[in-house]
Amino acid sequence: MDPGPPPPAAPPQAQGPPSAPPPPGQAPPSAPGPPAPPGSQAAPQAPPAGHQIVHVRGDSETDLEALFNAVMNPKTANVPQTVPMRLRKLPDSFFKPPEPKAHSRQASTDAGTAGALTPQHVRAHSSPASLQLGAVSPGTLTPTGVSSGPAAAPSAQHLRQSSFEIPDDVPLPAGWEMAKTSSGQRYFLNHIDQTTTWQDPRKAMLSQMSVTAPTSPPVQQSMMTSASGPLPDGWEQAMTQDGEIYYINHKNKTTSWLDPRLDPRFAMNQRISQSAPVKQPPPLAPQSPPGVLGGGGSSQQQQMRLQQLQMEKERLRLKQQELLRQVRPQAMRNISPSTANSPKCQELALRSQLPTLEQDGGTPNPVPSPGMSQELRTMTTSGSDPFLNSGTYHSRDESTDSGLSMSSYSVPRTPDDFLNSVDEMDTGDTINQSTLPSQQNRFPDYLEAIPGTNVDLGTLEGDGMNIEGEELMPSLQEALSSDILNDMESVLAATKLDKESFLTWL
């Protein structure tokens, strides 16, 4: 169905005279244009459905270059004109700097603009130890500090005068005045320099007095005591016409206003001449520790200390030799006469003598004298190194990190009863201790001094160590005797019955 032709458009409205003028203060009407459609109330015309408004701007690269040029070359850049400061809506105080106020109490307030009056907390002025007790006698000592009278404040408020302040009744220096701010803090006015400060000028005075006061009496006393003695040799005291005293040195043909008795060089020479001559100590041995023999003692004391150290060293050397003699015969118990002269036994004996020869300077150990003191014999029967168990400095403590069990000490894996039974099982000929050869069948003795080595080297170096390879094979094929089996059963039975045993059998 054809809707028909559209209705004719309304004729354009003729322009007539403007309406009544707008009231004052209202913006003038804009340029004449087509009237807004009815009901739109001059709202911006929305784009049709499905259309978007695209704002086309210039090249962004050129805009960035312009910004960089404005910064790098401010003279050649086209800086946009800004609104002058006079045309901006700024208060009048912006263009009028504050006038400097007179020096008065009203000018020193916390609300002022003076930046030089910031509180300064100096560490040296805040320590109560630097304050003399006599200066704060009028005040009272409180837990928060020194305060008195109106300066006292509640403990909850930490004011400046509660740290380290001088009471108000102590007079100020000339030209100074103390005032308080609205918050109660004290400051000081210097009328001489026309300045204000937070620092109390009385603190500097007290610190100067405390530094100069104690030093002056000793100096005067030392000068009086030193000047009261006789003049050095070659010096003479004389007096001028005005009554001034001067000193003549006849040795150098010179005069001086300074008393030679006050010169520390002459005083030192005088003391040295009056004191008794001291002998120079002999040169110390290289092995002597410098910390023990040094220290400014007399030569006699140093010689006594040196002799004591030498005696101690000799005594320790004798202990070690006695220990070696006590332990070495035990290694010869299980050596048969047939194997004592074997090359292997001689080699072990030579190796055991090497450390001893090095310690004694290449000479073998001498035979112990029968008149050796009982003290050395009792101290050398312990069976360990004297440097490890002597005194409380170093001792072989009980081990708490043993891997065998949870006990506080460790024991060897081989029980002692079994070792004793092995000694009884020796079927060889009985060896007389007096007829033993001089060869030693031991490892070097310094292995026994190592802590934690509880292995009996003498047992390991018995007949089994000296048997050659050809003799070892037939011995393994022999049947075990009944005596060995009986001994093993007795040892195992004793171990099972012993509840306190900490052996771990793997």
From Swiss-Prot:
UniProt-recorded Gene Ontology molecular function terms: chromatin binding; DNA-binding transcription factor binding; proline-rich region binding; RNA polymerase II cis-regulatory region sequence-specific DNA binding; transcription coactivator activity; transcription corepressor activity
Main location: cytoplasm
Highest taxon in the source lineage: Eukaryota
GO cellular component, one term: TEAD-YAP complex
Annotated positions of the Phosphotyrosine modification: 409
Name of one Pfam family that matches: WW
InterPro entries documented for this protein: TEADIR3_omega_loop (IPR053819), WW_dom (IPR001202), WW_dom_sf (IPR036020), YAP1 (IPR051583)
Spans annotated as Disordered: 1-60, 90-112, 132-160, 274-307, 356-416
Keywords: Activator, Cell junction, Cytoplasm, Nucleus, Phosphoprotein, Repeat, Repressor, Tight junction, Transcription, Transcription regulation, Ubl conjugation
Domain named WW: residues: 170-204, 230-263
Modified residues (Phosphoserine): 60, 104, 108, 126-127, 130, 137, 163, 273, 288, 369, 373, 384, 390, 399, 402, 405
Modification(s) after translation: Phosphorylated by LATS1 and LATS2; leading to cytoplasmic translocation and inactivation. Phosphorylated by ABL1; leading to YAP1 stabilization, enhanced interaction with TP73 and recruitment onto proapoptotic genes; in response to DNA damage. Phosphorylation at Ser-402 and Ser-405 by CK1 is triggered by previous phosphorylation at Ser-399 by LATS proteins and leads to YAP1 ubiquitination by SCF(beta-TRCP) E3 ubiquitin ligase and subsequent degradation. Ubiquitinated by SCF(beta-TRCP) E3 ubiquitin ligase.
GO biological process terms on file: bud elongation involved in lung branching; canonical Wnt signaling pathway; cardiac muscle tissue regeneration; cell morphogenesis; cellular response to gamma radiation; cellular response to retinoic acid; DNA damage response; embryonic heart tube morphogenesis
Spans traversing the lipid bilayer: none
Bias-annotated ranges (Polar residues): 371-393, 401-411
Family statement drawn from the similarity comment of this UniProt entry: Belongs to the YAP1 family.
Domain notes: The first coiled-coil region mediates most of the interaction with TEAD transcription factors.
The protein's name: Transcriptional coactivator YAP1
Gene source species: Canis lupus familiaris (Dog)
Gene from which the chain derives: YAP1
